[in-house]
Amino acid sequence: MQEHYQPAAIEPAAQKKWDDARIFNVSEDASKPKYYCLSMFPYPSGKLHMGHVRNYTIGDVLSRFKLLNGFNVMQPMGWDAFGMPAENAAMKNNVAPAAWTYDNIEYMKTQLKSLGFAIDWARETATCKPEYYRWEQWLFTKLFEKGIVYRKNGTVNWDPVDQTVLANEQVIDGRGWRSGALIEKREIPMYYFKITDYAEELLNDLDKLEHWPEQVKTMQRNWIGKSRGMTVRFAVSDDSKQGLEGDYAKLLQVYTTRPDTLMGATYVAVAAEHPLAAAAAADKPELQAFIAECKAGSVAEADMATMEKKGVPTGRYVVNPLNGDKLEVWIANYVLWGYGDGAVMAVPAHDERDFEFAAKYNLPKKQVIAVGDNAFDANRWQEWYADKENGVLVNSGDLDGLDFQTAFDAVAAKLQSQGAGEPKTQYRLRDWGISRQRYWGCPIPIVHCEQCGDVPVPADQLPVVLPENVVPDGMGSPLAKMPEFYETACPCCGGAAKRETDTMDTFMESSWYFFRYMSPKFSDGMVDPAAAKYWGAVDQYIGGIEHAILHLLYARFFTKLMRDEGLVNVDEPFERLLTQGMVVCETYYRENDKGGKDWINPADVELTFDDKGRPISAVLKADGLPVVISGTEKMSKSKNNGVDPQELINAYGADTARLFMMFAAPPEQSLEWSDSGVEGAHRFLRRLWRTVYEYLKQGEAVKAFAGSQDGLSKELKDLRHKLHATTAKVSDDYGRRQQFNTAIAAVMELLNQYDKTDTGGEQGRAVAQEVLETAVRLLWPIVPHICETLWSELNGAKLWEAGWPTVDEAALVKSEIEVMVQVNGKLRGKITVAADASKADLEAAALATEGAVKFMEGKPAKKIIVVPGRLVNIVV
């Protein structure tokens, strides 16, 4: 065995051994319990970042732990390869997105392999490959035929200069990120998935997810947003019907969760796209201008919540069905046409948003809820104004004095009797628009025919292949400029037709990839039925909490769609979810001449610390001049505080990177980058290596201790007790608790005790062998390369075949224990007694200790408190 730890030599050798034995390549095996462990697959951006390393190391630890415990472990990997960054990089570098993507995949795959992850690379999948998205297109056509996918107009951000649709994040202060042009809202035909048909099941099935973080489930419940309320129909005033047709000339319909406050409504607000707004604006330029302004604004609901609320009166009125009051209709920028009825009733006295709007435009506020003796002040919002739990109605005629639920029922009865409303359950969740006016995505498999309408592409003509030799110029959709792509024959009538040139939202690919991994080369369907039956749901899913809503919700939705198509036999995709924290690092900057900040990489900064090790000043190494310490933030390119994993691997080895990531913080918490922490991790691995080296230097490896320990010294018995207590703790930390930092700490403590124990002689050497073999197996999930090598030196066999160490219950039983002795609650000594010593024996032994005699000062004991197995407290 070589004397010094050399990761650059041992890590490739260990990886070759695993690859040659194909131990991570799995198939369905009914003789073993299955364990499907999956970390969210990466976008092939070019290089791994530390967040990737943490994410995939967590998954690898769990996978290797289960492998040693006899499970048939599948840990696949692939690439979420479609998306906007590839198009942006293509335009910047004048290269096709496909070429850029495939180059990145190759480099990142090399990086992942260098970290030694137990990945079944035979299952590798890239979502931009036709053999993958073919089945996505196939499912789309099936759902289109069933009506679960449908087409309707949707609102998008339109850049009039680049002639293209922009995502919300590409709109900066109302302008296009590339052209700088003022963005317009446009209505264009788009395809939608009826996720709302599954809203109730998506909500209810959250209760089945016992091993998901409660925070994630709460976020999904809020996103689905089930509410019980009422549809209320306000009659359009006779003097306000001009320009309106059909039902819109008769009624304005709104949904409210607070029908009890209907008597407090003082105006109604509608979206800019509402027919009533259009009718009112027909001869009013000021209304037309405001509507145009609204349409130029953001289409993101999140922006609606934070932007300044604006509105204009239409001069049109509707009638409150409860009291006959005429309420003016306002056009407001905070009302979304695509949500509900595109109209809301406003009760300024009891809704904070309406209160602010009414204050801005001097609209009346009518109190109809009272809470105790609290005084209503129309000039100042107070939280109790919206209290429906403790409030009762006032100023509401015969409804006065009613609580929320009673008033709800009474208003419902009145409105229903008039045909002016009815109770309704509504969801905040809206149908999922999947059309994207971009190139680098999965083509939508629809043909538009003037004779036959929208025709799904038949299964035998799939996939509709995306041309890969295209370099986008940012001016509209490239596919819409390629007759060779869009010109086709109608599958129904054979006449000239045009392919859909929109592509699918990239969330589509990530909504089912975990099923494709089960049979990635299966050519007769989305997933092989036998594989789907065996692997079932993902047992452990790992990823950032930023994916708590959209990705995880869409993945749950797709699972139910695929179940209903008979493709899988599970209701939920992920049994257990772990949301790892971010990797954060210090940030530093200097202010530049333009008033901005130039961010400086931590590697280029030299720090000065106070006597407690806290940084108090920083200078740039290059010039010795000060830089500002800006605090810790998530590693990012924008703050220039990232650390390249490849540099870390090159300097210290993959095991050091893995160990630091698992030891620095519990997995669900943020991990703060620390150079000293990395060095500490490397020191521990050198120490582990040295410990085994010194043991083998004294003689050849022996058979690990097993059997009765009656003949062992107390010191060796104590070491075996520590060993098996550590094994039990680490097993629980990996399996139930998923707290890897405490598992590592436990093994460190074990090695500390090993170093202090005399392991000479035949029995001592057998116990030493047992300790070292066990420590190596306990650490293999986290630092597999060094452990694989040390196991080979200690045992000569294959570690992955050795199995997880078992706990010797006999070793956990101590014949003697150490008990603290206190006098008046203060520690005055310790005694070693038989583990089964009686209360009287403990009292007698404690009273006889030197410390007790000294501090009792000859006084008699008033009381002796015995805590079995822990302490004796003598009270004098």
Curated annotation (Swiss-Prot):
CDD domains xref list: Anticodon_Ia_Leu_BEm (cd07958), LeuRS_core (cd00812)
Pfam families: Anticodon_1, tRNA-synt_1, tRNA-synt_1_2, tRNA-synt_1g
A cellular component term, taken from the record's GO annotations: cytosol
Coiled-coil region(s): none
GO biological process entries: leucyl-tRNA aminoacylation
Protein residues bound to ATP: K637
Swiss-Prot/TrEMBL catalytic activity: tRNA(Leu) + L-leucine + ATP = L-leucyl-tRNA(Leu) + AMP + diphosphate
Residue window of motif 'HIGH' region: 42-52
GO molecular function, one term: aminoacyl-tRNA deacylase activity
Motif window: 'KMSKS' region: 634-638
Alphabetized UniProt keyword annotations: Aminoacyl-tRNA synthetase, ATP-binding, Cytoplasm, Ligase, Nucleotide-binding, Protein biosynthesis
EC number(s) given by UniProt: 6.1.1.4
Highest rank taxon of the organism: Bacteria
Protein's cellular compartments: Cytoplasm
Similarity section: Belongs to the class-I aminoacyl-tRNA synthetase family.
Protein name: Leucine--tRNA ligase
Species this chain originates from: Neisseria meningitidis serogroup C / serotype 2a (strain ATCC 700532 / DSM 15464 / FAM18)
